[in-house]
Amino acid sequence: LPVARLIAIALLLAILPARSPAVEINILTGGPTGTYIQIGRDIAKAAEECGLGMTVHESAGSLENFLGVRQRPVTQFGIVQSDVLEYLKTFAANDPEVSRAIFGVRIAFPLYDEEVHLLARKEIGGLADLEGKRVAIGVENSGTFLTASLVLDLAQVSPGERLMITQDESLTALLAGDLDAFFYVAGVPAKLFASEEIDADSFHLVPIGDEVLRQVYKPTEIPAGTYPFQTGPVEAIAVKAVLMTYGYDPRRNAYHRESCKAVSDISHVISSRFQTLQETGHPKWKQVNLTELPAGWDIGECVNVGLAPAYRLPCDPPEAETAATPVDTTSESEANRAYRRQICAVVGC
């Protein structure tokens, strides 16, 4: 279990930095040009308009973000891919290290889908053809690295070489003949694949439709013409970006109490300004479904506090009556049922 072990070992060896004297609000996102950091900046802007300061941090991606929420003080939020959450939850029951690694981490909000791209030489027709080949899987600790590793493991495919390099480096190597294929997880359309250097006679997006993967990932399709070299639709899978938080206990101490309030405040900002985020934020906000919760994970109690009808911030407009649409929540935890009721009351279902 390479990915789960990596997370567990990193947690066990982590050294906690000194805690700040006052609780700040922080979110871990991703690289400087990625979607995660833009989503984080949108949230921070909405928070600022409400008089709340939130610092947006670059990171290596999902793994660092999960570790940060779990282990790093004054780091209340981090964006993590849903397949990593699924993998951890699956193995936590039988692996004490993994169980400790995920303890206390909770969902804040589900976000948007990200498509798994696999660009390869034309003769590679499917995942099985990657056996023994040179395959780039992204920089270590990035979301692409984690997803590519999981996809290859689940499909039981063993490339001859797994290169941990950036997507730009991967494309250069592929075009030069030094690579057979590379993975890239990014929302469609991904700017990288707009390059006119990608010759349709030599390269293509490999369809990913393996049944075992479709049971774990969301089946999707990359429409024809999304990229200059792509003439037809391509079967694909998608992962969901999820905003994660920690299950702070306000009864424990002042730090937990203040951190819980920070989570409640930001949760209130996101839910009450969701329409504005969709209208003025990154285009991916338009694809966010706040009720599409990953299975097996609970909403943080501090999140639900911020979603309660009575929760108010000084920047809130006058209260208005909103009728909630009834939803079937009988199979969920009480925390998730409460979340759905309150989200439906705010944004509708």
Region locations from a protein language model:
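Pocket-lining segment of extracytoplasmic ligand-binding domains
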Residues: 158-262
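Pocket-flanking alpha-helical
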Residues: 40, 57-99, 170-173, 189-197
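Alpha-to-beta junction loops
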Residues: 70-79, 134-135, 176-184, 200-201
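Bacterial N-terminal signal peptides
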Residues: 5-15
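Bilobed "Venus flytrap"/periplasmic-binding protein-like clamshell domains
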Residues: 23-48, 114-176
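Sec/Tat signal peptide C-region and signal peptidase I cleavage site
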Residues: 18-22
